[in-house]
Amino acid sequence: MKKVQKALLVLLRAGLWESRIEDLSCFPMSAGEWKNLYLLSRQQTVTGIVFQGIQYLPEHFLPAEELLVRWMAETDAIERKNMQMNKALELLVQWFTESGVQPVLQKGQGIASLYENPLLRECGDIDFYFDSRQMFEKAFSLIRQCGLRGKVQADQSVTYAWKGVEVEHHTCLLDLHNPFLQRYAKELEQQYGYNHMSLEGGQDVRIPSPVLNLLLQSLHILKHALGWGIGLRQLCDMARSCYKLHDEVESEEMKKIILKLGMDRWQQLLHAFLVEHLGLPVAYLPYQEIASDSSPLLDIIWRGGNFGLYVPGHQRKSQSLLAGKWQTACAFQRNIRFAFRYAPKEGFWVFSSLLKGQLK
């Protein structure tokens, strides 16, 4: 691992757990190395958490004041965007609730609440799941009545902008593409159900129960790891979720579910990464089985950054739909060995769905 990458992980662990820095061997760093570390933290969308980690560095190891001021301004922008997101989420949930629609908040601000300082986690969009087709259609009808332009995506999700924030509506809670496991996924949803969390203004919103929450994130990370790539932010989310939800998850049950989904090798790899690189104590894993080597996942993370946006050739908006599908297919092909080593069945069906244009 390169010096800058190692230093990033050291500072990330300190910021993620708000604890002292355990390894100072990477420091001091040159101005050029600090600049690269800053850019890498932005690529991985962990700028605010790494800045928090810098607070634990001895003064003589700190970067130049000019970069610190720039980093501070970027962190302040992240906090302000989170506050905007929280207000938009509150208003949208309130409107849906008053209209008889009960969304389930996926990831996002629900996961942010598990951080020591939620405002430092970089937010993306608002993801809602609707547990019936009727509820999904009612929500879609409501946004159209308000003049919002909802766009139907290839995977049948709906996207639109609400008060400056991108919102997505989903018909599936778990990113599971194996058709032979869809019934089991629904059974899990019915068995474990949902919890409630209070938003800042006091409005309640449904969130996945701890078991579903951990499964949702694991599958989400896997899907993106198989394609363009995944970033450190999503792995930090998983680490914080394991830590905060540990007492609400029964390890033998979780292991049984993972085995039935055929994800045991993947889960062991994920566990190894969380422990080795993000500092999650082994005792807080959903169950204590760990791969001997986490480097295959680490390689994917360094290669692509946040959802693979920094992979050479990755374009958010391709010149054509066909070109976009081709690019995504090529991205998956690069990870084909990874897929069939760690999640062969799910990897096969993710690729099949991708070819049919069912993935974003």
Language model region names:
Residues 1-124, 130-360:
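Conserved NTP-donor binding/palm subdomain of two-metal-ion nucleotidyltransferases/polymerases, i.e.
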